[in-house]
Curated annotation (Swiss-Prot):
Cofactor binding mode and count: Binds 1 Mg(2+) ion per subunit.
Organism: Anaeromyxobacter dehalogenans (strain 2CP-C)
Cellular component GO terms, alphabetical: cytosol; succinate-CoA ligase complex
Keywords: ATP-binding, Ligase, Magnesium, Metal-binding, Nucleotide-binding, Tricarboxylic acid cycle
Pathway terms, separated by semicolons: Carbohydrate metabolism; tricarboxylic acid cycle; succinate from succinyl-CoA (ligase route): step 1/1
Function: Succinyl-CoA synthetase functions in the citric acid cycle (TCA), coupling the hydrolysis of succinyl-CoA to the synthesis of either ATP or GTP and thus represents the only step of substrate-level phosphorylation in the TCA. The beta subunit provides nucleotide specificity of the enzyme and binds the substrate succinate, while the binding sites for coenzyme A and phosphate are found in the alpha subunit.
Chemical reaction(s) catalysed: succinate + ATP + CoA = succinyl-CoA + ADP + phosphate; GTP + succinate + CoA = succinyl-CoA + GDP + phosphate
Cofactor (UniProt): Mg(2+)
Binding site for ATP: K46, G53, R54, G55, E99, C102, E107
Designated name of the protein: Succinate--CoA ligase [ADP-forming] subunit beta
GO molecular function, one term: ATP binding
Gene that encodes the chain: sucC
Quaternary structure annotation from Swiss-Prot or TrEMBL: Heterotetramer of two alpha and two beta subunits.
């Protein structure tokens, strides 16, 4: 689960992480009032959406007066903010965060996430703050400092100091950085976060270490332990299809292609997407209906796929083990009839009750394109999407 910058800073504040003062605003007048509360000097007006790169898209502006803060908020609220992470449609800005300005001496990067190759939490730091860290890692991997944390000891002071020295810090700034990194680590662990990222982490002219921006993601499977964090979910920032999928316990991720996919099993779903790509097509989604789906769940999955206007063809790839092919077939028929299927549908079934499933589809009066293996199914789906 993702949350907004202002929410992440609210959490980090509780763990002693230094963040600038700021106030949320949902109207231009509220933004003006927030700037006045901050003293009426220089402030930053920041669009709150679940995406990075806001500054490049016009989503972060400096205001030198409360009146200017109101003007910036007026321009931002309601705009479709486009960044490299939003896609071409952009995301609507519904709220802004007005934050006090500070005199910046240096911009750095500090982040924490799980290194799945090693099976440990990795703390990463870089002198290249305020820019796309993925780009830095790709072009200048030597500029990324890393420390791997033992779950038995947690982040040790010597590790935080080693990062600070690697960033070129000295004197009181080292002490402040160690305190900052320790607070960030404590917040990460205590909240079951999957990502905690400060970009940029700034060193002010006065030597303070501040989180100028903050991003936190959380493990959905641990949210039952954190009702306060679960309450921070913003449905307006989530894809409606993904929200609907969660209601039916479906694993769905929207992508940019035009071939809808419905598969049982995450591994088979990823393999299906790979074969579609190898066949010259682009998958429109990842969708795993799981091993114990019933007809209603399959129907819901089918409707979610078809609700994407970019989908030109659908590929259903089912290997029936616990999931029976006849259940999938009945769900396909029910959903196709309910939504009035008008795009090509390619179905590949194999496994338990496969003959019964094929018979159900054959007698459904639907224009279904059958396939006997995954390669054939992918090729037919790509051809159908191109012809649509």
């Amino acid at each position: 689960m993702k949350i907004h910058e202002y929410q992440a800073k609210e959490i980090l504040r509780k763990f002693g992480v230094a963040v600038p003062r700021g106030y949320l605003a949902v109207t231009p007048l509220e933004a003006e009032g927030a700037a006045r509360q901050l003293g009426g000097g220089i402030s930053a007006v920041k669009a709150q959406i679940h995406a990075g790169g806001r500054g490049k898209g016009g989503g972060v502006k400096l205001a030198r007066s409360p009146d200017e803060a109101r003007q910036h908020a007026e321009a931002m609220l309601g705009m479709m903010l486009k960044t490299p992470q939003t896609g071409p449609e952009g995301q609507e800005v519904r709220k802004v965060y007005v934050e006090e300005g500070c005199r910046i001496a240096r911009e750095l990067y500090l982040g924490m996430t799980l290194d799945r190759e090693i099976g440990r939490l990795a703390v990463m730091a870089s002198v290249e703050g305020g820019v796309d860290i993925e780009e830095v890692a790709a072009k200048h991997p030597d500029k990324i400092l890393r420390e791997w944390i033992s779950p038995l000891t947690g982040l040790m002071p010597f590790q935080a100091r080693r990062l600070a020295f690697g960033l070129g810090l000295s004197g009181d700034s080292v002490t402040a950085f160690v305190r900052f990194a320790t607070g960030l680590y404590n917040a990460y662990v205590a909240t079951d976060a999957s990502l905690a990222e400060i970009n940029p982490l700034v060193i002010t002219v006065g030597g303070e270490v501040l989180a100028l921006d903050a991003k936190m993601n959380f493990d959905d499977n641990a949210l039952y332990r954190h009702p306060d964090i679960a309450a921070m979910r913003d449905p307006d920032e989530e894809d409606p299809k993904e929200t609907q999928a969660k209601e039916y316990d479906l694993s769905y991720i929207a992508l940019d292609g035009d071939i809808g996919c419905m598969v049982n099993g995450a591994g088979l779903a990823m393999a299906t997407m790979d074969v579609i790509k190898l066949s010259g097509g682009q998958p429109a989604n990842f969708l795993d209906v799981g091993g114990g789906a019933d007809e209603d769940k399959v129907t819901a999955a089918f409707k979610i796929i078809l609700s994407d206007p970019h989908v030109k063809a659908v590929l259903v790839n089912i290997f029936g083990g616990i999931m029976k092919c006849d259940v999938i077939a009945n769900g396909i028929v029910a959903a196709a009839k309910q939504v009035g299927l008008s795009i090509p549908l390619v179905v590949r079934l194999e496994g338990t009750n496969v003959e019964l499933g094929k018979e159900i589809l054959a007698h459904s009066e639907l224009k279904i394109i059958p396939a006997d293996d995954l390669g054939e199914a992918a090729r037919k789906a790509v051809q159908a999407a191109r012809a649509a």
